[in-house]
């Protein structure tokens, strides 16, 4: 192998949705991008999550110079509570919100005290030295705030890893993709682009997140009873839209699901989730509101059996049950392989 060659090893995220994990290796230095999980296929009963196979890394932990996280979705951070013990003492680098979401997961796993979490601000244009690699985070638009990609200067040239992104001219948080940084990379010359390509085969452009807010407004205006919105626990922008819509329609909002409740708490503490009308309430207090004055945001948009929506559909949630006149919004497209699980939950709601 040439002396300036860089090896890229994908431990997940290729020809599949989820389990994103990429290694870049040169000599005695390895950097890791993301550490996610995938959801099991329909023919994998009894399995809750699928993790990347990190056997290659376990044999080379002394070479790991850092784990760099693009954003806080499960398919990019969900593997950390399970795999980080085998990767220590490697530091984990993330933006502010992503670091906060990782902290919640590691605290639950009793790993936070052992972890070396390091925060960066992409707007400050940092350059992080990691062995022979120089990592430059840049902001991208996604359905969660504080998402980034990485420009990685390597002995073989500049490699750009986009992470998940969209070119959204009207993002919920008002923060655009850093086009100036992308233009700078173009001028410097990019040796390799490692790009998100989900739905790349679909014609046209991905709509702005604001389109979802318009749909929420219509559904909330028509709803006569309670409104249930199922989403991902880490989809902070979607939770913000539910809060804003509920406030406009005179409804309180109760988060359902431990992971969602924790993420809402940390996002509020860090200023990434706002509730100026004080519509957020605890699930145990939601019963005191009339049906037309309460909305729930919950986990379970992918039909996960232990998530809040599944427990509501099965009639075994301790705080709430769905009934006639209620409206349920499943605010996510089923991940490939999850369609049957999602439709099974929907059927049980009727």
Over which residues does each language-model region extend?
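Conserved acidic residues
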Residues: 65, 191, 294, 326-329
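Gly/His-enriched, cation/cofactor- and phosphate-binding structural elements
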Residues: 253, 330-331
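Anaerobic metallocofactor- and corrinoid-dependent redox/one-carbon enzyme cores
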Residues: 295, 312-313, 322-327
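Conserved two-lobed SF2 helicase motor
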Residues: 293-302
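His/Asp/Glu-enriched, well-ordered alpha-helical/loop segment
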Residues: 344-350
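His/Asp/Glu-rich metal-coordinating catalytic cores
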Residues: 1-68, 73-289, 304-321, 337-344
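Aromatic- and Gly/Pro-rich donor/ligand-binding loops
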Residues: 300-301, 332-336
């Amino acid at each position: 192998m040439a002396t300036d060659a860089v090896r890229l090893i994908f431990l997940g995220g290729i020809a599949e949705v989820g389990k994103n994990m990429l290694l870049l290796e040169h000599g005695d230095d390895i950097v890791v991008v993301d550490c996610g999980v995938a959801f099991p296929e329909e023919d994998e009963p009894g399995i809750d999550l699928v993790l990347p196979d990190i056997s290659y890394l376990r044999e080379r932990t002394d070479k790991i110079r850092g784990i760099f996280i693009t954003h806080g979705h499960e398919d990019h951070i969900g593997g950390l509570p399970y795999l980080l013990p085998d990767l220590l003492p490697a530091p984990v680098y993330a933006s502010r919100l992503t670091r906060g979401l990782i902290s919640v997961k590691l605290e639950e796993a009793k790993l936070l005290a052992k972890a070396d979490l390091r925060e960066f601000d992409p707007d400050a244009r940092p350059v992080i030295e990691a062995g022979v690699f120089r990592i430059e985070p840049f902001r991208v638009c996604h359905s969660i705030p504080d998402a980034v990609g990485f420009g990685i200067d390597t002995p073989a040239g500049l490699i750009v890893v986009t992470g998940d992104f969209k070119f959204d001219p009207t993002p919920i948080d008002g923060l655009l993709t850093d086009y100036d940084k992308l233009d700078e990379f173009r001028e410097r010359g990019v040796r390799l682009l490692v790009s998100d390509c989900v739905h790349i085969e679909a014609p046209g452009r991905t709509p702005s997140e604001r389109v979802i807010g318009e749909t929420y407004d219509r559904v909330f205006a028509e709803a006569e009873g309670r409104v249930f919105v199922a989403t991902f626990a880490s989809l902070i922008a979607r939770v913000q839209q539910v809060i804003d819509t509920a406030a406009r329609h005179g409804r309180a909002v109760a988060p359902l699901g431990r992971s969602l409740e924790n993420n809402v708490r940390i996002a509020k503490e860090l200023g990434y989730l706002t509730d100026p009308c004080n519509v957020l309430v605890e699930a145990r207090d939601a019963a005191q509101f009339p049906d037309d004055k309460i909305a729930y945001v919950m986990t379970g948009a992918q039909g996960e059996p232990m998530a809040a929506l599944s427990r509501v559909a099965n009639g075994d949630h301790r705080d709430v049950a769905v009934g006639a006149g209620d409206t349920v919004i499943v605010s996510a497209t089923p991940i490939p392989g999850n369609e049957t699980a999602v439709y099974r939950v929907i059927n049980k709601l009727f």
